């Protein structure tokens, strides 16, 4: 596959600024959240061969899809215009409404997913690590959501600071856990590879496993919510001095490096989990509807014979890190969901007039809807991977893959990017992810 020269000799002779490093880490940190804790389950579900194929696809999916979205954001005439303003400029007010809906429905299902996840993670920690009697699911979900609602309502600024602070400790913990699992690696996943029994088609075939894995990669390797802000920042910094073409290449360079970091950390974590567990263990984790760290904690707690202090520490650390990761991701996506829902309420409930309702009342109304719907989904307890594949990933793909490809096909300002092989790749990734909805209904 051809990936055009985003990193050119000219760009390499320019100074790499501190702000470029900051944004590289910012994009990287945005993507590394609770979604990563489910990727090893889907990736390892089919054994070694599908995850090796996903390893090959991971960087192109992460880099090319986000670069396409960045190019759309760069196509607006206003350096300070965000993606909504850019889409409105190109496609009118209807386009602005569509992008507002897409943003809201791309983020809100993620909150539902995290609501289910944090409830299940807390309950399995309570029952397996603390060895306490089972609790009522509805009460647990309500208590956890009320706790987060109180933190959000009374300490938004503190929440943002804590959330930002937790990004890199969480990444460090993922790397440390991946390294810590090495002594527990085994060859079972390799021994189970039987080339004579490999099936390409069918429900458990390699093609279907990789297809569903692409959806989880789109979900897990996703920093699209921050791409618009990133592009605006880089345009304001570079475009007046070096021009738009250079700014586009600089954005591509930063996205490329962030994608490399992200793929390296997530794939190492996935392989470490797979070599510690087995495809059968991954199937159990999916059936139990818990993230892989919670399953690892339960796995270590059920080990026969005498256990080392290290394995006991890892058992508790895995559960606590999972809880922190989900809290972090929930808070981050809550802010985006609140902003999107507030925009929809003002646009359709008050005809765009912000003066007709106070911000406090608007936030309270939106909070009741968000928390109420999240509690209901958490209580019902749908399978998280199925929810990701049927709702979260397809909506993200429509925004991350298909919208930029449509813009490149239609807009004169993006005409120079037409006809490139990577466009077909991004389009296929988007369509495959969306077609998961049809597959889930069959």
UniProtKB/Swiss-Prot annotation:
InterPro entries: AA_transpt_TM, Amino_acid_transport_2, Hydroxy_aa_transpt, Thr/Ser_transpt_TdcC. It is a multi-pass membrane protein. GO terms for cellular component: plasma membrane. The chain crosses the membrane at residues 21-41, 44-64, 96-116, 139-159, 162-182, 206-226, 258-278, 312-332, 364-384, 388-408, 422-442. Keywords: Amino-acid transport, Cell inner membrane, Cell membrane, Membrane, Symport, Transmembrane, Transmembrane helix, Transport. It is found in: Cell inner membrane. It catalyses: L-threonine(in) + H(+)(in) = L-threonine(out) + H(+)(out); L-serine(in) + H(+)(in) = L-serine(out) + H(+)(out). One of its GO terms (molecular function) is L-serine transmembrane transporter activity. Belongs to the amino acid/polyamine transporter 2 family. SdaC/TdcC subfamily. Involved in the import of threonine and serine into the cell, with the concomitant import of a proton (symport system). This is Threonine/serine transporter TdcC. It comes from Yersinia enterocolitica serotype O:8 / biotype 1B (strain NCTC 13174 / 8081). The gene is tdcC.
